[in-house]
C-alpha cells in the first residue's frame, strides 16, 4: 500500500492538500493525468492540474491495517 500526498494547483483555484492511498506506486505524471479534467464534447480545453510537493511512500505493514478498514 502506498500513501501519495501532494498540493494540487488548478488554474483559477487555491492550492489544496491532497492524499490518496493506492495498492500500486504511482508517478507524479500519472496522478496529474488522473486529476486533470476529462475532455468533453463541445469543450475546447481540458482543465490541467499541477502537483507540487509530490510524495509517494510505501507504508509499513503495521500502518496498512489502519487504512484498509
Swiss-Prot record:
Q: Which range is the signal sequence, renumbered to this chain?
A: none
What is the official name of this protein in its record? Double-strand break reduction protein
Species of origin reads Escherichia coli (strain K12)
What's this protein's function?
Helps to maintain the integrity of the chromosome by lowering the steady-state level of double strand breaks. This region of DNA acts as an antitoxin to toxin RalR, a DNase, but it seems to be sRNA RalA that has the antitoxin activity and not this putative protein. Therefore the identity of this as a protein-coding gene has been cast into doubt.
| UniProtKB keywords | Antibiotic resistance
GO BP of this protein: DNA metabolic process; response to antibiotic
Null allele outcome, as annotated, is: Mutants show increased numbers of double-strand breaks. The single ralR and double ralR-ralA mutant have increased sensitivity to the antibiotic fosfomycin.
Entry-linked InterPro entries: DUF1187 (IPR009572)
Amino acid at each position: 500500500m502506498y500513501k501519495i500526498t501532494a498540493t494540487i494547483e488548478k488554474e483559477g483555484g487555491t492550492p489544496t492538500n491532497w492524499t490518496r492511498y493506492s495498492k500500486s506506486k504511482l508517478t507524479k505524471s500519472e496522478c496529474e493525468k488522473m486529476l486533470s479534467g476529462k475532455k468533453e464534447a463541445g469543450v475546447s480545453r481540458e482543465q490541467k492540474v499541477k502537483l507540487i510537493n509530490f510524495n509517494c511512500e510505501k507504508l509499513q505493514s503495521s500502518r496498512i491495517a489502519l487504512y484498509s478498514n
